[in-house]
Design a protein with these regions (language model features):
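Jelly-roll (double-stranded beta-helix
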Residues: 1-399
């Protein structure tokens, strides 16, 4: 984000002496994107931020994927993936991979326990809070998050998730191999959100703090690139990473609640790009929120049938009643995967039922990817095998 923030104790000039009350020096760390050519922040640590005293492999949950072959639309019931074990599960180690490709991985987790300290060395994360409450503690400070929040965590940000509600924390995790930003068309050339953007800087919540935590020989989990894909390392650092007395800059984690998204509507059906909220390399994130729908006298409010020949479409249904999917078995916590090369659209009867409807009370998060998605173990474990045949009245192989 080009939106500048300052928190805690920073010196008047960057790259100059910043002394402790005892006369020692704080250690300055520049955290920046694209080398030294994009957004960055300067953090001032009590300890040396590069110090480690141990490093060993961290065994990640399964990252294996299976091609979508034969090519069919799929329905994944994510709420089936977790039972009572959620109480001892955390948002980092408990993620189950649902879908992925070389640009983005989508996981789901239901958690009740605090995570270990963690940073993603591959790319930014966008975690959508389907339900529950948590505090996200980071080197930049803390964020209190709740249902409907998108939490954007920049690459290499050390943080941990601490559930704070009485019930489970349900998190839909989008992990990029790139940065996740507002769409370029929403931004001025200096990075300000423009008048036509469906949200603005006032809607974004930054960290508060700073956090100052004492500790010695603290473990930090790091997800990073390996020869055969995504791997993990467990560092032990000599002092707690939450030792930042102050920072300033334009790179930091932030939260944005889906209820603050202002939907763009029209007389006839508007295409998915008007619902876009973020973008990464070779994928976009959109949301479909409660809204007034098409008001042309002959409009058909549900989507027309379409073939997205260049992308796979993933819809995560997280609230309301999704009109176009009535009769498909899809409900809250469902994912639909409609792959490129396959025509998709409303279920039978939805076209006709939508005529005259003036308002859609629906909430869904969509990820469109420009490379084919494969199924992770969480995807294969939660699949509804009958979904592909629902446009044909249930007629399918062996039926």
């Amino acid at each position: 984000m080009a939106h500048y923030r300052q928190l805690g104790d920073v010196p008047p000039k960057r790259h100059t002496q910043h002394r402790t009350p005892e006369g020692g020096l704080y250690y300055e760390e520049l955290m920046g994107e694209e080398g030294f050519s994009s957004d960055s922040s300067l953090l001032y640590h009590r300890g040396i931020p590069s110090a480690i005293v141990d490093a060993r492999p961290w065994e990640l949950p399964s990252q294996a994927t299976t091609p979508n072959l034969p090519l069919i639309p799929r329905h994944l019931k994510l709420h089936q993936l977790f039972g009572e074990e959620w109480k001892g599960t955390d948002v980092v180690a408990g993620r189950r991979l649902v879908l992925g490709n070389s640009d983005v991985r989508i996981s789901y987790v239901v958690a009740g326990a605090p995570s270990e300290l963690y940073r993603n060395g591959l790319g930014d994360e966008c975690v959508y809070v389907e339900d529950g409450e948590a505090t996200v503690e980071t080197v930049f400070g803390s964020l209190d998050v709740h249902r409907g929040d998108y939490v954007i965590i920049p690459r290499a940000t050390t943080h941990r998730w601490v559930p704070t509600g009485e019930g489970p924390l349900r998190a839909y995790c989008i992990e990029a191999n790139s940065h996740i930003t507002p769409p370029k068309r929403y931004l001025s050339r200096f990075g300000q959100l423009l008048e036509h953007a469906p949200y603005c800087e006032r809607d974004l919540r930054g960290p508060v703090g700073p956090l100052l935590v004492d500790g010695a020989d603290v473990d930090v989990l790091v997800k990073h690139r390996g020869t055969n894909g995504v791997v993990g390392t467990r560092y032990t650092v000599p002092h707690h990473p939450f030792d930042v007395v102050g920072w300033d800059g334009c790179l930091y984690p932030y939260a944005f609640n889906v209820e603050d998204y202002e939907p763009i509507t029209g007389r006839i059906h508007q295409p998915p790009p008007v619902h876009q909220v973020f973008e990464g390399n070779n994928f976009v994130i959109c949301n479909f929120v409660p809204r007034k729908v098409d008001y042309h006298p002959l409009s058909i409010p549900v989507p027309y049938y379409h073939s997205n020949v260049d992308s796979d479409e993933v819809m995560f249904y997280c609230g309301g009643d999704y009109e176009a999917r009535k009769g498909s078995g899809i409900g809250q916590g469902s994912i639909s995967l409609h792959p490129g090369g396959h025509t998709h659209g409303p279920q039978p009867g939805a076209y006709e039922r939508s005529i005259g409807v003036e308002f859609f009370d629906e909430l869904a998060v969509m990820v469109d990817t420009f490379k084919p998605l494969e199924l992770g173990e969480g995807g294969t474990a939660s699949e509804d095998p009958g979904y592909a045949w629902t446009w044909s009245g249930g007629r399918g192989p062996g039926r």
